[in-house]
Amino acid sequence: MKILRITVNGLPLFKQELDLLFYTQQRVSEDDKEKLYKIEPNYYLHTACAFIGINASGKTSVLKVINLALNILRNEPINHVESRNILGGCENASFKICFFDNKRNICCLETVVKSKKAKAGGYVYSIVEEKLWEKPVSSVKSKKYLTDFSGLRPIAARNTDEAYLPDDVSFIIAHNKKTNDRIDVFSLLSYTNINVLPFTDDIPLEVITFLDPTIEKLCFEKIEDKALIHLKFKGEEELILNNAVELEQYLSSGTIKGIITFSMVKEVLASGGYLLIDELENHFNKEIVVTLMRFFMDSSLNKSGSTLIFTTHYSELLDEYDRNDAIYIVRNRNGITAENLSYILKRNDIKKSDAYQSGFLEGTTPAYEAYMRLKKNLAASLK
């Protein structure tokens, strides 16, 4: 199962409809094909999607929407999904998720979610309406109509027959079972500011030495109910630790995050799934970040069409892209918006980082007035 498009309406933090496309909009050259994933002749998916914006622009919120949409599609109860808080106190939030299934059909799931105040505080969410459309990809005449279902009747709608279903679980579960289809989602949203290495049976030595060449050994051992960590640096005695938190005394935050991330990358590339990372550059140097992006963009390595979806502050990362349509500019001006760079910047040959830093794209650099106020405040405090 591959995601083609996510369109969301009715979210409190968003200024307007959020419309995210994961297939190519611009013309695909022969060179481009090496970095894309082909689902059909002339139809290609991005393997690395970037969301960039200044601080507090709403990048994390966009990633939460994507995470929630993917989890709806994989039959997860909405009230158990960590990113459900993006729904807030929504009255009727509508998710339209277009995807390509393993029967070579283009499908569109529309799920309407409402909130209800919980007695203990917060909100409880339920699905109040659902419809599913389907059409064979062979019936699509051009890319323009790939996710267009106008004029088609839904093949299924949520009704009382789904009484056995929890009211926060999508009825797409029936379609997934019928087609024996699934979607694997790996999220590092919760690891943005927390770096604790979880217990794992296998940390590839190649990952460890890539991140820190001074480490000779790092592995977990489970004895009864107790987990021990064996850590050895070259030329030093082996250390045995009782708690993963203790690793922070010996390893950098970048090494810990790197082990978590690259171990997950291995699973994602094997499954053809989705990896969501907030602030990709956090704790990493540029070379490590670029390496991670290139793993997904390398069709000889990424044979299953796995997708990296990430946020960043760093415009230099945009220059890794030959295309503009895999990049979204996120802004928050009385509400969050995400705009595809190909709609703003028509030419691919313009250096993307320069366009971003220059302010040409609007809303991509801190406001000059805010900068001057901060400078004056700092100057006054130093008198």
Regions inferred by a protein language model and the residue ranges of each:
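C-terminal lobe/lid and adjacent interdomain/linker elements of RecA-like ASCE P-loop ATPase modules
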Residues: M1-K2, M293-K383
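Pre-Walker A-like glycine/lysine-rich segment at the N-terminus of P-loop NTPase domains
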Residues: K2-N67
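Hydrophobic positions in the central parallel beta-sheet of the AAA+
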Residues: I6, L275-I277
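Extended helical coiled-coil dimerization/tether regions that scaffold
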Residues: N9, D184-Y250, E369-K383
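Glycine-centered tight beta-turn/hairpin loop motif at sheet-sheet or coil-to-beta transitions
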Residues: L13, F100-I106, K234-E236
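Conserved P-loop NTP-binding catalytic core
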Residues: Y44-A50, I54, K64-K114
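Conserved ABC ATPase signature
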Residues: A48-N55, A227-K266, I277-E287
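Electropositive, glycine-dotted interaction segments
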Residues: V113-E224
